Design a protein with these regions (language model features):
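An acidic, glycine-rich "communication" segment
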Residues: 1-83, 87
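Extracellular ligand-binding/catalytic regions of CAZymes and related secreted enzymes
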Residues: 74-149
Length: 149
């Protein structure tokens, strides 16, 4: 709850309902749009930018977060693989796995007690870390979370 979402490797209960394991997909080229352009974390960023990175089909608690980033990727079963299948040795499989459609929100902020929380899903590969927009995003997020903005 503190982070604002969860990734599961096995089916289980989440916030009072049964959910399947989460999904993943490596090396997805997608466009990210800034959902909150006036937020300090968005300072200096274009309205949209492209990344190629891993994406996750997981639980996002949209009622408890302030969206910051959205992807144009479709967060549906056909575009992801089952995390449970992966950890049991079947890496690129979604057989008999029928999760609900997921959230396209890739980054968000929230407050927990006196702490600022920021979650950024991108950051799985060197290409992402080498992207100037991602580096600006990450620097802004660190400053914001540390109350330096």
């Amino acid at each position: 709850e503190i982070i604002g979402g969860r990734f599961f490797y096995n089916p289980q209960d989440c916030r009072g309902r049964s959910v399947l394991d989460s999904g993943y997909r490596h090396e997805v080229r997608h466009e990210i749009s800034i959902a909150s352009p006036n937020h300090p974390i968005a300072h200096g960023l274009p309205d949209t930018f492209e990344l190629t990175d891993e994406l996750y089909l997981c639980e996002v608690f949209e009622d408890a977060i302030d969206p910051l980033l959205r992807s144009d990727h479709d967060f549906v079963r056909e575009k992801f693989y089952s995390a449970h299948h992966a950890v049991t040795g079947n890496l690129y499989c979604n057989d008999n796995w029928y999760p609900d459609e997921g959230s396209a929100i890739l980054g968000w902020t929230r407050q927990h007690k006196n702490s600022r929380i920021v979650y950024l899903q991108p950051g799985d590969n060197t290409a992402t870390f080498g992207n100037a927009n991602y580096r600006q995003l990450l620097a802004n997020a660190i400053r914001w979370a540390a109350h330096r903005q």
